Amino acid sequence: MLHLKNITVGNPKTAEQYQLTKQYDVTWLFSEDGKNWYEEQKNFASDTIKMVYTGDGRVVWVGKDVTGIEPRNASVIEVPDITANRRITAPGYWFYRNDEFVFDYRLKAEDERDAL
């Protein structure tokens, strides 16, 4: 399962990328370990769930089609398509913390209280 952390905009790293940037105004996205987002997409399995979470861990996107993800300033993790993982929704109160997905009941209760 793949986990690309802290994906941000970066400069082209090859002559080919530079030419694509000049010609088509491509924005390059790289994970914190230097992996190219566009090249890594082919490594995601089609039968898994992909989730995008922000720097504070909030899950902001859940789905299977990796091409539908715009991960700028976020992280992408791939998880098995099992019942427990299908319960995770976005937007909502799900967070990725300490290498697991957790539901923040306190934040939900505070939001409900504030809405009264």
Describe the predicted segments one by one.
Residues 1-27, 32-35, 41-43, 68-71, ...:
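A preference for well-ordered globular domain cores
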Residues 54, 61-116:
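Negatively charged, Asp/Glu-rich surface segments that serve as flexible interaction/assembly modules
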